[in-house]
Amino acid sequence: KLGAIFAPLLYQATKDGNSIQPRFTLPLVKNRIFGGIAKRSFLNSHSEEICFVDSKQSQKTRKVAIFIGCLGNYNYKNVGESLLVILEALQINAKLAKGQKCCGAPAYFTGDFASVDTLIRQNVEYFESFIEEVDAILIPEATCGAMILEDWKHFMEKDLELKSRIEKLLPKIYMATKYLESQTNLVEILNNIEQNRLKQEFQSPKQTFTYHDPCHARKVLGVYQEPRKLLQQNYQLVEMEDSTACCGFGGVTIQTERFALASKVGSKKAKMIEKTQAQFIVAECSACRMQLSNALYQANVEIPFLHPLELIAKIIKENQNK
């Protein structure tokens, strides 16, 4: 709350409105840009239970919980809002899981293992309290997804009881695009929207996007085809030279103590993105978004960075407004 109140004193919105930049030269931030700070977090903007379908009228009604992640909750709030638009179109009810804690990734990557242990235990206990009432837990963040789906059980390797509890939860936990592509009819819905567009007498060409594969999504979880398949129903994919090359974010230590290295890696990726001449750069990761938005800004490349859920929700809302 204090961040949202005082941020305008130090920062101003970038031209595209998706990030903020310092009004003055500050030693720590070194003129880089960041995701804006929402006045109200995503989790505090809605009731915990969001019903798009009356479950009393239909026994087939599905419900998913949303693990939004810290950056999605406070900085990139529209990711969660977009997921709600999609779930409404799918007639799937949502639980915002307001008792969720940080997944523990920042503490894990900086060696604060006591905090990691506490956060995992708190989250596992909380997930267990509602897991039977939902069909899935969706995570629209690659880093959180990898931490929960892979690192939690490895961290708790010696605590067999807790590791077993984690493994019982995992079958219901998905990266958001993986669940939406494989477990729903979203592809069909988006394809129908596109087919109706093609029937119009005057058709504008498909907007183009290039996709950056977050390390945690593709290299750890194997999620890379699903977001592309969803987006390609309504957008034209222009692959960059190496979509799997790391963006350079590298975690808290790299962003503070080794920022010159992060900038060097980010600059290479920004050049790849610019060469595609795509209208959007897309990735299912807010850490990549923060890093590459800054890299593009420093290179004076005006290509907006969006989450795949934002582009999908954009199509759904445009279709609803016709």
Question: Language-model segments: what does each one mean?
Answer:
Residues 1-322:
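Iron-sulfur cluster-binding electron-transfer modules in prokaryotic oxidoreductases
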